C-alpha cells in the first residue's frame, strides 16, 4: 500500500521568538516493512542531519531571525508492505523497553490496577488494560502538561493522550512487559 504523507507542524507564538532550535524526528527509513520512495523535510533556517543511538535520522534546525510563525513540513511517498502485528525490530532488544523513565514510573497502586486487569499477559488483556485506563483517567484537555508523569496523571484521574500512553507504558513495564511510545 502506498501512502502519500503531508505532515505540517505550525508554531504560533504570542511574542517574537528568536534563536530557537528544533529537533525534528520525521525521517522514516526503508526497512523490511516499508520503502521510502521519496521524502523531503522543509524547515526554515539552518539545519544539519545526524543519527541517534538507534540509527534513526533526525534534523537539528536553528532559526537566528525573529519570527512569530514557523512551519515545518514533511512530505513523501512510503510504500508499506504487509506485516504481522506485534513485530519487534530484531536489532534492538525488547528488554531496553523495560527501563523506567521519569515519565513512566509505576507505583504500587498502579501496579495493583494493572494486575487486576491483566490476568494473562496477552494482547487481549493489554487492550482491556488500555480501555480501563481510559475509564479511570478521563480525557481532559489542559489538565496536565508535558512534565506530568504517569503516576501524577493516574492519581489525578485526568489527563490527555500522552498521559494515557505514559500510564499504559508504566503499567506494562511494571508487569515486566516491554513497552514504548511509537
Residue map of PLM features:
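Linear, non-domain "peripheral" regions
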Residues: 1-112, 176-177
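Secondary-structure boundary elements
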Residues: 82, 92-159, 167-169, 174-175
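Active-site-proximal binding-pocket segments
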Residues: 164, 173-182
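Short, charged low-complexity intrinsically disordered segments located at boundaries
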Residues: 38-40, 55-56, 70-72, 141-145, ...
